[in-house]
Amino acid sequence: MALTKYKLGELIKPCELKNDELKYNIPDVKGISIQKIFIETKANMEGVSLKPYYLVQPDDFAYVTVTSRNGEKITLAHNTTDKTYIVSSSYIVFRVNRTDLLLSDYLFMYFNRPEFDRYSRFNSWGSARETFSWEDMCDMDIELPSIEIQQKYVDVYNAMLANQQSYERGLDDLKLTCDAYIEDLRRRMPCERIGKYIEQIGRASCRERV
């Protein structure tokens, strides 16, 4: 499989649209977690003007340049919804502008690699606060297969995520069933001391049983 090397800055561009007309309000304000997802903001928004806030439109990325005290991860997310969010003007918002060469979903897969977190931390600079700047982001080398191959990787990745989420939902359902069964037993069965159902096993006995 042939790979072509690019500087990431050749494939992405900053997005600096602001909420000048106050079209978006407090419910649209988002933060970003180190799990690389958008979350509800934890900031106190009382009296804060939302005009300087950046728009994160569908398929846009946003990240926080400060990497210190982040658990060795960079705070970055990809808006995969059909909604527009707004984020603090201290964030950097960008999108893929060479969609003929790079799929945004493939780029987000790349960002989710532990190697990218290590790279961004290693290339962060500063004294009081270390930052991974936009210039540092753009200077990063990335090797890409064809768009068709990228799409295949994305499809496999999404299928794996769907399987994982289905498995986790199954565990949640099983837990609910077990909890309901135990609660039902508590109501129907008399309480007993468990002493007659258990016994202490010494180390010697354990070895003998093994």
Model-derived segments and their meaning:
Residues 116:
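Internal, well-ordered alpha/beta segment that forms a basic, Gly-enriched binding/recognition surface
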Residues 1-19, 141-203:
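Non-catalytic DNA-recognition/assembly elements of restriction-modification systems
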Residues 77-79, 123-126:
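Short amphipathic beta-strand starts and helix->beta connectors
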Residues 84-90, 125-151:
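A short glycine-rich beta-alpha junction/loop motif
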Residues 1-44, 49-52, 65-66, 70-72, ...:
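Low-complexity, Lys/Gly-biased intrinsically disordered segments
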Residues 58, 62-112:
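A short beta-sheet element
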